[in-house]
Curated annotation (Swiss-Prot):
EC number: 5.3.4.1
The organism of origin for this protein: Ricinus communis
UniProt family annotation: Belongs to the protein disulfide isomerase family.
Annotated site residue numbers, Lowers pKa of C-terminal Cys of first active site: R129
Protein name: Protein disulfide-isomerase
Length: 498
């Protein structure tokens, strides 16, 4: 009996602890400065706020766990701001909230969105991830998109020598030009700082003759400032985006250059990248000639980057480049085409870029060396043999695109070996593989987004992606269903005619 009573009291004790824990968790939730949103209250809550920040998170996400105390602390700071700023969160991993995650294009965790005007305007959060930084960034974001500059002292405060700052000069703060400028400032405020003034004399390098309307963009590189007088919204936005980039983006170990490198690779223009040893003998001459080329082709749909070999190893691996080709220049277009000039001299740069612009340069293709021996059951394909083995062989080819580090590819390898052995006596069938990390793939034919990806190309040119189970029998069934037996039929028809 005593043992039974002891068990009862133990259960009561455990249940009491659980109740206390639940109560503490509920109390913590109640005291939180961060609003908890879900599919039932999201739209209604957002519609009531002119400015609100929403974190889309997943409970299992390590980065989300790290952000949580900082986000909570920032919310506590911001709720006592002159104009309170509201921070909220949504568990995007919850089934009921996944539609919200899709609606707001959430592709990773945590993702923070700034919602203005009751959710009508949506911007990415691009600020720090620690409490004080979050608070300061959002204080600026919740204020006016552009600050009025009333004195030289104010201008010096806002316009530093190490950042980009855009100022609109106007004869009055009204009219179409002013409204369009403010519209662009509001749209781009997450990326740039904006100001406006009635007197250009307040500005660095300001001239008393400038009365506006004019937009002046200050930057810590190239010509230091540039003016623009077209107040069409699209034209003004394009001016800000293009003028805030260096004529030549520098890719090295300096962190201050990294934002420009990111913008460079996000640009829709063709990208010319010159990689060299920054300490090499001809470095200064190459840099000078490259700058000249950048100015020569500015605004012609091509942007330029100058990369130090030591900082560019990732790019070398991606493009299949070798250090003995340095100095080199490679151009990549939006459709994936690449053009390479290796071991260039300073005087080679301008003529080669001109030839590229005129369509006179042959495309470059990243390829592993052609194997000297290729007698295994599964044939090795590289970019330089893709045409011969897959497209022009007149055979039915099953081709696996793999990555050497991919676990699923390693599991598939012995299965493909078995399939290949099964077709050893069938001359019309080829089982092959291509390392997609070391060879360029024609994206207009094969859509490779993960590994392994398997395609089948029939002898007559029909291409089908395999999405069945990765078993020997299923793969063979797929091949038999899609193979082209026209050659065999023609042979049979020829015998009948005889």
């Amino acid at each position: 009996m005593a043992s039974f009573r002891g068990s009862i009291w133990y259960c009561i004790f455990v249940l009491s602890l659980i109740a206390v824990a639940i109560s503490a968790a509920e109390s913590e939730e109640e005291q939180s400065s961060v609003l908890t949103l879900d599919s039932t209250n999201f739209t209604d809550t957002i519609s009531k706020h002119d400015f609100i920040v929403v974190e889309f998170y997943a409970p299992w996400c390590g980065h989300c766990k790290k952000l949580r105390p900082e986000y909570e602390k920032a919310a506590s700071i911001l709720k006592s701001h002159d104009i309170p700023v509201v921070l909220a969160k949504v568990d995007a991993n919850e089934e009921a909230n996944k539609e919200l995650a899709t609606q707001y294009d959430i592709k990773g965790f945590p993702t923070l969105k700034i919602l203005r005007n009751g959710g009508k305007s949506i911007q990415e959060y691009k600020g720090p991830r620690e409490a004080d930084g979050i608070a300061e960034y959002l204080k600026k974001q919740s204020g006016p998109a552009s600050v009025e500059i009333k004195s030289t002292e104010a201008a010096n405060t806002f316009i530093g020598d190490k950042k980009i700052f855009i100022v609109g000069v106007f004869p009055k703060f009204s009219g179409e030009e002013y409204e369009n400028y403010m519209s662009v400032a509001d749209k781009l405020r997450s990326d740039y700082e904006f100001g406006h003034t009635l007197d250009a004399k307040h500005l660095p390098q300001g001239e008393s003759s400038v009365t506006g309307p004019v937009v002046r963009l200050f930057k810590p590189f190239d010509e230091l400032f540039v003016d623009f007088k077209d107040f069409n919204v699209d034209a003004l936005e394009k001016f800000v985006e293009e003028s805030s980039m260096p004529v030549v983006t520098v890719f090295n170990s300096d962190p201050s250059n990294h934002p420009f490198v990111i913008k460079f690779f996000n640009s829709p223009d063709a990208k010319a990248m010159l990689f060299m040893n920054f300490n090499g003998e001809a470095a200064d001459s190459i840099k000078s000639k490259y700058q000249e080329v950048a100015h020569q082709f500015k605004g012609e749909g091509i942007i330029l980057l100058l990369g130090d070999v030591e900082a560019s190893q990732g790019a070398f691996q991606y493009f299949g480049l070798k250090e003995d080709q340095v100095p080199l220049i490679i151009i990549q277009t939006n459709d994936g085409q690449k053009y390479l000039k290796a071991n260039l001299e300073p005087d080679h740069i301008a003529p080669w870029v001109k030839a590229y612009k005129e369509g006179k340069v042959q495309a470059y293709r990243k390829s592993e060396p052609i194997p000297e021996v290729n007698n295994e059951p599964v044939k090795v394909v590289v970019a330089d043999t893709l045409q011969d083995i897959v497209f022009n062989s007149g055979k039915n080819v099953l081709l696996e695109f793999y990555a050497p580090w991919c676990g699923h590819c390693k599991q598939l390898a012995p299965i493909l070996d078995e399939v290949a052995v099964s077709y050893k006596s069938d001359a019309d069938i080829v089982i092959a593989k291509l390392d997609a990390t070391a060879n360029d793939i024609p994206s207009d034919t094969f859509d490779v987004r993960g590994y392994p990806t398997v395609y089948f190309r029939s002898a007559s040119g029909k291409v089908e992606q395999y999405d069945g189970d990765r078993t020997k029998d299923d793969i063979i069934s797929f091949i038999e269903k899609n193979r082209d037996k026209a050659a065999q039929q023609e042979s049979a028809n020829g015998k009948d005619e005889l």
